[in-house]
Amino acid sequence: MMLSISDQDLSLRRRQFLKIGGLGLGGLTLSQLLAVREAAGIGQLHSDRSVIFLFLHGGPSQTETFDPKPNAPAGIRSATGDISTSIPGLRFGATFPKLASRSHLFSIVRSFQTGDGNHDIKPIVGRDSGGANLGSIYARVAGTNHPVTGMPRNVALFPRAVAPDSQPENNNFGRFTSTGALGSAYAPFVPGAGGNAQADMQLMISRQRLDDRRNLLGELDRVKQAINVEGLAGNDRLNRQAFETIVGGVANAFDLSNENQKVIESYDTAPLVRPENISRKWRNYNNYVDNAQSLGKLLLLARRLCESGCGFVTVTTNFVWDMHSDVNNAGVEEGMQYMGLPLDHALSALIDDLESRGLRDKVMVVACGEMGRTPKINARGGRDHWGGLAPLLIYGGGLKMGQVIGESNADASRPAADPMNNQNLIATVMHQLMDVGQLRTVTGLPQDVMRAVTAAEPIPGLL
């Protein structure tokens, strides 16, 4: 149900409040919001940077992406071939021509290990994050909403955020909204059909009144005092985030129709892989379609949210990188046509957009999955699970770009130098989002937060 507020009368019925996407009223008053922010934010320990974490669920191949091993024997080297990049001597898999021409703008880690070949959602949620989404750790330090715009600090984007007819998010291998021991107040805000629907953030009220945040909150406070709110505390996170999003005047950030059409077209990955060109013999067909239809627009939406004050955006499509060549999934050569081309286009569009907007130092982009793939292609033309090495791309955030960090061995099965793991990646992300040195002096923070932030050193050469 959409909340309706007229310009003439801001009084709202209790029943209307209770049905706003299943929300109640907890956490509405300015004093309560400030108290929450003070308790959660603990001063200004966080930076003004944002992170877009693109999780490539299923486990992309290190060989067909950024470590093609062109001199290795057939069956080990990239099945899609390889191409030169803007960095002399550096080669990528052949389905990444756009990223190849921009390789000087980001860094690749060729010695990254996720630790095992299991399907889960590490490193975004896993043992090394204390069972919490990395964005939830950030929100525990920075607060759940931006104090000026009201934008949720921690957002998770699934295909339905931009493509309502797509499949629901896949939680079979872990929940991207997990918060570990931090509590549900710090869970990612989920727009679209999988969470608080975009329609639930639209108010029938003039822009002038919507932007008058103090007046609107005052009216809402008076309504709250007139009704019984004792039973609404369990929905405090949803209430606070949804209403702060509404009254902060940032609901438009979630609506791509407010974006310049040429910018939308520059991100759009749908024309690259048409549904009729994807084989229906794979059980993953619908997810392949959803990925192509949504990936570019998801990254565009992530950029819009970062500009409006979001600090951490998880972006993922549904489990499309598992290229065994079995009844569920295509092999690597066919699968990279479905997956590599949209990823190449979408990441390149995001990098170009951030560069043109002067956001290179303000927004960090991370792209990786839960594992890599076997160094040897199987008899069916697929690659199987492999935890010994995985691809990792990092852009922006004030880090040193245009680098290849670490080195893999001859068949891309293990690091040959400078091994990096999930803890190093998490430390790198957290050092960009918060003042880790100052954080060490703060008492009262959950051990899971401190452990995730301080368990390892950031990836050397980036800071």
For the regions a protein language model found, what residue spans apply to each?
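Ligand-binding pockets and gating/stacking loops
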Residues: 1-463
